[in-house]
Amino acid sequence: MKTEEPLSATVEEYLEMIYNMNMEDEVVIGARLAEKFLVAPPTVTEMLKRLVRDGYVEMDNRRQVTLTETGNQAAEAVLRRHRLTERFLVDMLGMQWHQVHEEACRLEHFISGAVEARVITTLNNPTTCPHGNPIPGSVANARSYLKDKGAIRLSSVGIGEVVSILCISEVVEDEEALILYLHEKGLTPGTQLTVLGEDGGSGGGNEQDESFKVQVDGREVCISKASSAKIWVTR
């Protein structure tokens, strides 16, 4: 019997990124993917041609990219391994919340089905990764998780509103400076905060834009508008 060839790490990373951008209602086009992966546009163009050829993605007349059912299943399989690995690194190995994304990116491509099953059993079938994102297969309809939870971006919350952090965008988990800043300031899933108002400076990440202050556990924290758009909250 012919064994299906495993996907390359690069293909899996593209499928993950497209899935996450689709989930967060971001427009997925070649130029945006080039920005995310820090590669030249022609590199992305060639990869998208391959993904279309192999039946993983479709492109409309505006060159917007969406996953096919095959692509969606493949993306969820690798995201499941990624988020389970993050959970294992935090819960079992004691690594810090902000340290595990890169490690999981390296390990996710090599985890067998047997190891995945053992991790699930050991961790009692967790439903989210340490950053609050859903684990496909452990959460029904993971792709619509944000909509089902009624989540909104922190940047859209009005002054004086009290909200709870649901998750941090998977799309920006590789922005180490931002993830470390959120960790240090206690802006993690489950944290309740109050939006206080505009602030003249910039906080979190390297964005030089306007920012606003939030109150967390009685402390005032400054976060940039760009960074706050990467935090999903619920009222």
Language-model regions, residue ranges each:
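A short, conserved structural fragment
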Residues: 52-62
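Basic, amphipathic "hinge/linker" alpha-helix immediately C-terminal to the N-terminal HTH DNA-binding motif
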Residues: 63-82
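Basic amphipathic alpha-helical segments that dock to polyanions
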Residues: 14, 33, 44-54, 182, ...
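Extreme N-terminal segment that seeds HTH/winged-HTH DNA-binding domains in transcriptional regulators
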Residues: 1-38
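Helix-turn-helix DNA-binding elements, focusing on the entry/boundary residues of the two helices
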Residues: 30, 48, 86
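Mid-protein regulatory/catalytic core that forms ligand/cofactor-binding pockets
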Residues: 109-226
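Key DNA-contact positions within bacterial/archaeal DNA-binding proteins
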Residues: 42, 98
